[in-house]
Regions:
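Active-site-adjacent pocket scaffolds in enzyme catalytic domains
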Residues: 1-86, 91
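C-terminal domain-boundary segment and adjacent tail
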Residues: 19-40, 91-151
């Protein structure tokens, strides 16, 4: 799988990625196409397949308390609950910025504590939850794509 920087890519990138064996494209619900051409937006849903046969894996839960305090524990658990109530997989987006302490040790410690609390809350609320990598989720989606179960 791959994710384009800042969620900016176009069809040419998808074609090249497919040629080198990339099956899954990670991103948000909204994709910005190349700024070299007039910027335009495309919208994707979890498990959508493109013309190259690749699947989109859309990030739908966010743990980004360093960037925006409202994107911490409560919001992430709420978004995850919404996904699970709809029988959809949850992909949690987070970045190392939330967990490094070089500049702000308190930030690292607080966010590591909150992320651990989030994982514990998920397991407590959903004891049969499965954690997997993006590639593993992509494999599940691609296997289920042509069955009655749609992601």
């Amino acid at each position: 799988s791959m994710i384009a920087p800042c969620y900016i890519w176009d069809d040419c990138i998808e074609e090249v990625a497919a040629q080198v064996g990339i099956q899954y494209l990670q991103g948000g619900i909204v994709q910005t196409q190349s700024v070299l051409e007039k910027s335009s937006l495309k919208y994707h849903f979890m498990g959508e397949q493109n013309k190259c046969g690749q699947y989109y894996l859309t990030r739908n839960c966010f743990f980004e308390p360093t960037q925006d305090i409202s994107l911490g524990f409560d919001r992430c658990l709420h978004d995850l609950t919404c996904c699970f109530e709809l029988n959809k997989p949850a992909i949690i987006s987070t970045h190392r910025l939330n967990f490094v302490g070089e500049l702000e040790v308190k930030n690292r410690d607080k966010n590591l504590f909150e992320f651990k609390r989030l994982l514990q809350a998920i397991v407590q609320k959903y004891p049969d939850v499965e954690f997997m990598s993006s590639d593993e989720l992509g494999d599940v989606i691609s296997m289920d794509h042509n069955t009655k179960f749609q992601i």
